[in-house]
Amino acid sequence: MVRGERMLCPAWLLALAVLCAAGSEVRAQCMEDARCRDLTTDENILDCIQLCRSDLTDETPVYPGESHLQPPSELEQTEVLVPLSPAALAPAEQMDPESSPQHEHKRSYSMEHFRWGKPVGRKRRPIKVYTNGVEEESTETLPAEMRRELATNEIDYPQEEGALNQQDKKDGSYKMSHFRWSSPPASKRYGGFMKSWDERSQKPLLTLFKNVINKEHQKKDQ
């Protein structure tokens, strides 16, 4: 029996500590009482627990209605605030840097199908065609079809064998003999309106004179 009473003492002490930890004001009132100062006997412990419990019920207001509509107690509020550590409240810039490259990689991959994303292939550079000696160096880079086109163009439009003399350049104007309209025949210039008197046919004038003479003779006869 004595052993059972000794085992009950730690349990009562633990319950008393929980009640005292519920509020600072309740703890102060409990410690001021003489029964709570002398905890050697079980009667004093039970009386102290009842005193602290009554003080705790007096301090906490009782709300009418269902229990789920009542405001949370201080213990529940502390339990809710403990999981919110400073690391969870830290801004996104102070997060682990290893997670940011993955986000950037996903973003770049998702932006590939837009116009400003990654290019699909290399841009084609314009092919430079040289008409002088540099062409021999660039023939290796040109495809076979381009070389054939250049060869046919050279055959169709051959260059003049000799350059113009310096005297011809000084004296006369430059003749564009390599163009189709450079030197048309005189009969086709300006649509044939600028023909000379000798080149034009004189038959219309002769018929005109004959008609005038015949009319004058007819008037005289009348």
From Swiss-Prot:
Specific enzymatic cleavages at paired basic residues yield the different active peptides. InterPro entries: Mcrtin_ACTH_cent, Melanocortin_N, Opioid_neuropept, PMOC, POMC-derived_peptides. It is found in: Secreted. Keywords: Cleavage on pair of basic residues, Endorphin, Hormone, Secreted, Signal. Its main location: secreted. GO terms for cellular component: extracellular region. One of its GO terms (biological process) is neuropeptide signaling pathway. Residues 1-28 form the signal peptide. Residues 29-105 form a propeptide. GO terms for molecular function: neuropeptide hormone activity. Belongs to the POMC family. This is Pro-opiomelanocortin-1. The gene is pomca.
